[in-house]
């Protein structure tokens, strides 16, 4: 579904679309919470860039095991608790307490290899993490043999 560059103010409730492969709605006027996408089990790409989103529902991205790209740049998001999501996450230019950060979380299914970031950073279950940004405030240990660097 491609809805970019319109004046949409909402995106409905997409959880009942299990065959949805991509959802692109950047450059609109979408407000409020990102809805629950957990029922979109084939979703691989989501772009809600440059909207007016402030939060997302708990579990909005759970069960999205095929997801590999989310772009949430240029919104008004204030939360980062994406513990179970292993994707390319572009969340900079928001109001997240940890700072404007572009984060790549790559899905690695062979072995655990989890990074030991504190849960308050929202990335405690990430297997691969690449963070780009200034003063992003992450702390914790990296396992001695990471799966990928």
Show where each model-derived region lies:
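Conserved hydrophobic position(s) of the canonical leucine-rich repeat
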Residues: 8, 20, 31, 40-43, ...
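Beta-strand-rich solenoid/repeat architectures in extracellular/passenger domains
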Residues: 16-17, 28-29, 39, 76-79
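Conserved hydrophobic beta-strand positions in leucine-rich repeat
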Residues: 1-3, 21-25, 46-48, 70-72, ...
């Amino acid at each position: 579904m491609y809805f970019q560059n319109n004046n949409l103010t909402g995106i409905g409730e997409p959880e009942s679309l299990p065959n949805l492969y991509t959802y692109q709605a950047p450059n609109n006027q979408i407000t409020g919470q990102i809805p629950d996408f957990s029922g979109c089990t084939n979703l691989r790409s989501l772009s809600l860039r440059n909207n007016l989103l402030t939060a997302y529902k708990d579990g909005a991205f759970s069960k999205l095991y095929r997801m590999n790209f989310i772009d949430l740049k240029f919104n008004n998001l204030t939360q980062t608790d994406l513990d179970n999501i292993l994707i390319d996450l572009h969340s900079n230019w928001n109001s997240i307490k940890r700072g404007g950060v572009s984060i790549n979380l790559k899905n690695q299914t062979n072995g655990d290899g989890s990074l030991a970031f504190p849960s308050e950073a929202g990335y405690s279950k990430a297997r691969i993490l690449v963070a780009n940004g200034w003063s992003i405030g992450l702390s914790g240990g990296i396992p001695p043999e990471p799966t990928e660097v």
